[in-house]
């Protein structure tokens, strides 16, 4: 009889702890990452010699099953259920020249996921796109094209102006800047944990629909915080576009402004900085990681900063 009673209590407790997608708690395995036990060194992954040889083979040669399985496992373990990013250690292939690195990236990208090609008024993304300072300089926080400038890129997620933002992206550091240019990251799970601690109502506000406007004729309405069909976090953030869309976001009031301000200030508290060495390849989960970049300088006597970028579905 007591066994039956305990079984009933267990069932009731299990039912009470179940949550719907709408009520999904912010607490996660990433709670207060990276300020507790996060080790940046754990994000680095060597490129096995067999995989490197496969990637450097002729472009018409099929990728081996070994390489495909290695890449799939890496994405599953590190990107979708791990820290939200990983770095292929460039010292594993430091002897490669730029053309060889482009070749490697073009061979590697389809192994990691489904690359996206996207051309719009805001940007051009090919299978592999060059990221260099093209002389663009911002005159307003509402007019930003981070990949074409040497100015600071504040925390954001990629492709927020699209109805369905990208799932991940790759950056291959061909040439570091003469000075500056470090990358910054914020884990969105940790960010939401912290905001919920301040006031649970903060999360309710971020779940409302906001307009993201590029000021170039591209505008989409979406919550900042949502979840996919599998319950995975989908965090969308580009402060400039949210500000551009403010006139169309009819629910914007003092409370919304307070939450936006709190989100910005909390991001600053949770940043980690990653300085990519020549050859390092970083792959980032765009739905759970915000990224940014410090301002940088090129120099006439130093090769200019140059990265390769790939987007993934």
Where are these regions (language model features)?
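Active-site environment of non-heme Fe oxygenases that use a 2-His-1-carboxylate facial triad
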Residues: 6-75, 79-86, 94-95, 126-313
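Long, mid-chain structured domain cores
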Residues: 81-128
């Amino acid at each position: 009889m007591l066994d039956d009673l305990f079984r009933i209590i267990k069932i009731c407790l299990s039912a009470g702890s179940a949550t719907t997608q709408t009520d999904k708690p912010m607490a996660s395995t990433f709670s207060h990452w990276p300020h507790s036990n996060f080790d940046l060194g754990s994000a680095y992954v060597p490129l096995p010699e067999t995989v490197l040889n496969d990637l450097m083979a002729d472009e018409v040669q099929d990728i081996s099953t070994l390489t495909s399985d290695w890449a799939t496992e890496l994405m599953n373990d590190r990107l979708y259920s791990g820290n939200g990013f990983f770095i292929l250690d460039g010292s594993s292939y430091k002897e490669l020249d730029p053309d060889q690195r482009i070749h490697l990236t073009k061979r590697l990208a389809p192994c990691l996921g489904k690359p996206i090609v996207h051309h719009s008024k805001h940007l051009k993304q090919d299978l592999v796109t060059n990221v260099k300072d093209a002389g663009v300089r911002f005159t307003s926080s509402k007019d930003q094209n981070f990949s074409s400038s040497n100015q600071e890129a504040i925390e954001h997620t990629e492709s927020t102006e699209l109805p369905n933002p990208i799932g991940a992206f790759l950056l291959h550091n061909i040439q570091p800047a003469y000075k500056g240019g470090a990358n910054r990251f914020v884990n969105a799970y940790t960010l939401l944990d912290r905001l919920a601690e301040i006031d649970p109502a903060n999360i309710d506000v971020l779940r409302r629909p906001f307009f993201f406007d590029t000021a170039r004729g591209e505008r989409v309405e979406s919550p900042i915080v949502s979840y996919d069909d599998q319950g995975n976090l989908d965090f969308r953030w580009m402060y400039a576009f949210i500000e551009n869309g403010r006139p169309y976001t009819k629910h914007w009031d003092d409370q919304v402004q307070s939450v936006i301000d709190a989100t910005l200030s909390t991001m600053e508290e949770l940043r980690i900085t990653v300085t990519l060495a020549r050859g390092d390849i970083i792959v980032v989960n765009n739905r759970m990681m915000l990224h940014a970049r410090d301002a940088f300088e090129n120099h006439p006597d130093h090769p200019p900063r140059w990265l390769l970028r790939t987007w993934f579905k």
